[in-house]
């Protein structure tokens, strides 16, 4: 790869991240949590510039998270990019008991449904709502309101799902990591979470677990965004 950093060597699984911002942190935290849960040896590489040619060759979308890992025979380098893909890769490669990825086709399909819904709906909708609300130089009230309205529709779907008997999380255990960043505030701008009590409860429950607290900075030794290049 052109201009590949000399200190980057794929000896074990490498998770690529960027220094945390309001919109970049959560996607990389999710595979990190799953790696920790499964006890997978790994390194974290903090990318200085995602537009660099060497990184574009790894992920043409120029975003994190990205995983690189040697193939079992050591001949090839495997890669996964986008947060949903990295979660599925980790589960396929390391979750031999199906604890997080599902123990059969039915459970795996259920998990993948909710992961894909997040990727296609709530994730990008919330990202662009936040962008137009906070960062876009020109205020566009109709655009902001449309995105906010779409977010409430998607939260309604989550709340109904969690209202089903015995449904503590959206799918099998894996899916709890997709929801770990929800609802740290009851209201933000004109978007309030008071009506989504089950979503809030599930988010708070997950956010208090050690595997979630640690990557979010509760343990400074394992902060997701270290000053060094790798862990």
Curated annotation (Swiss-Prot):
Catalytic activities: RX + glutathione = an S-substituted glutathione + a halide anion + H(+)
Enzyme class (EC, first level): transferase
Protein name (database record): Glutathione-S-transferase
GO MF annotations in UniProt: glutathione transferase activity
Enzyme Commission number(s): 2.5.1.18
The keyword Transferase appears for this protein: yes
Keywords: Allergen, Transferase
């Amino acid at each position: 790869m052109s201009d590949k950093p000399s200190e980057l060597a794929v000896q074990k699984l490498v998770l690529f991240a960027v220094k945390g911002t309001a919109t970049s942190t959560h996607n990389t935290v999710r595979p990190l949590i799953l790696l920790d849960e499964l006890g997978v040896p790994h390194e974290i590489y903090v990318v200085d510039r995602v537009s660099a040619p060497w990184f574009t060759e790894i992920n043409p979308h120029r975003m994190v998270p990205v995983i690189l890992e040697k193939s079992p025979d050591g001949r090839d380098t495997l890669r996964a990019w986008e947060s949903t893909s990295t979660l599925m890769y980790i589960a396929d490669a390391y979750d031999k008991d199906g604890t997080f990825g599902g123990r059969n086709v039915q459970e795996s399909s259920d998990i993948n449904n909710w992961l894909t819904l997040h990727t296609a709906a709530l994730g990008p909708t919330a990202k662009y709502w936040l962008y137009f609300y906070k960062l876009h130089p020109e205020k566009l009230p109709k655009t902001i309101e449309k995105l906010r309205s779409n977010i409430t529709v998607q939260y309604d779907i989550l709340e109904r799902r969690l209202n089903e008997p015995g449904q503590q999380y959206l799918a099998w255990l894996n899916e709890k990591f997709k929801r770990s960043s929800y609802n740290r505030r009851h209201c933000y701008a004109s978007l309030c979470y008071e009506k989504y009590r089950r979503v809030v409860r599930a988010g708070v429950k997950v956010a208090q677990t050690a595997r979630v607290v640690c990557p979010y900075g509760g343990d400074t030794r394992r902060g997701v965004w270290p000053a060094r290049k790798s862990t």
